[in-house]
């Protein structure tokens, strides 16, 4: 149920009847304050100006045509021409009933699209670090939301599995006689990578062999391909452990690494030349883009093939976008890549559009994100100033949560304690990130994220268990409640019901904008509204059974909405805390 969409259409029709153009925007928004109703239509200002009318005069005319019978109990004009809409308690009660009768809580299924989501993208032969956290969990929240809405989602883990470094790694693997690399841990590979690089920099003979190995690998030699495959397999096996710990939905089947696009690159360069988009410049193949200027104010040159014949990330990204449209049949492509890559992506996509590889009707969206910072406001590092490994961060989260949970539940059995600590610890790390607007940097703070107050995972998980405890005390099951009517008489009942029915609107925003913090804010607000409702509207000690059961149904929908909402974020809920 999308009340905002329903009201938007009703107000739009009334505006047209009042003389507004057919493409007018009613600008219906959820009201920020209770006194302004549940929704506000703010579109009169812009339209009245075009019509040469006062906004309030237009609003008055719109009201004469606006039929919200059975939807709103009151509609009023406020200020210079805002229209405030107060939802009818009977309408709220009816739709709460409908939401409870549906597995999807009344959320409609939009027109199905094929959506490719590019996220996580770790590098082969390197362990995942905190820099991979945001892309992985924000991308996963978007994927879960889009899938819940009914879209076909293709997860694309754009792994860094190709490049000149593989000659060096294979040469070092061979030199160390480590053909048993399948048994290596990725932690070994981290040191292995450093040692290989050191050797490459200091031993010219080794470096020459490494360069030859790159050529052999790129020409498809079976032995070198097998060695490369070992390095990829070890890396992805270790990364899968991290994905599983993080409760994200990526699997080995979702790997679409850089190597996938290699066979396409010569054809892309030849085609761009044939189309007159790419030209030779100082021995390299370059596309000059008028949209981007260099310091001299001239069109910027984007290299797609180096003088030595090598390709660049841009070339791969052009091939990648083409593949996602032509082969995966994407209707929309989302890239969860940090903000520092924005210009690079814009240049690659400008070439993609000019070449006609992806039509303008298929959006290519950079859902960029900021950095994770330490309390000092600088990039998050270890005490020694090194990069924080993601596995180490999750270990620390688990350890801190274990202490916190044990303190609050000294008699809890060990296995239950471990399960709860895992849900709280991993949930805290994820929620602290997801609850921030992804476009900004954020401060990583253990104390804040593990607090039981404020917009945190522990608070949200606790809020959910608190609602469940009402049911346990009521000693009533869902079947017994099903036939009971919902009656809304108190203001706090109406406020909670209206917010519950805004779940679909929240999902729609997350799906459209790729902003999980909007869902976090909604759930936090919902938990707060339930708390006020619980305090002022007695449930178990209600004046009669009818009111008791009605309030239990509001509590029931609150629990289901909190659980489903946290689910779309990849945050685990627990029955008791």
UniProtKB/Swiss-Prot annotation:
Which superkingdom does the taxonomy of this entry point to?
Bacteria
User: What EC designation does it have?
Assistant: 6.1.1.19
Compartments it resides in: Cytoplasm
Reaction equations catalysed: tRNA(Arg) + L-arginine + ATP = L-arginyl-tRNA(Arg) + AMP + diphosphate
Q: Which PROSITE patterns match?
A: AA_TRNA_LIGASE_I (PS00178)
Q: Spell out the subunit comment.
A: Monomer.
- Quote the InterPro entries the UniProt record gives: aa-tRNA-synth_I_CS, Arg-tRNA-ligase, Arg-tRNA-synth_N, Arg-tRNA-synth_N_sf, ArgRS_core, DALR_anticod-bd, Rossmann-like_a/b/a_fold, tRNAsynth_Ia_anticodon-bd
Task: List the source organism.
Answer: Escherichia coli O81 (strain ED1a)
GO cellular component terms listed in the entry, alphabetical order:
cytoplasm
State whether keyword Nucleotide-binding applies. Answer: yes
- Report keywords, A-Z: Aminoacyl-tRNA synthetase, ATP-binding, Cytoplasm, Ligase, Nucleotide-binding, Protein biosynthesis
Q: What is this protein called?
A: Arginine--tRNA ligase
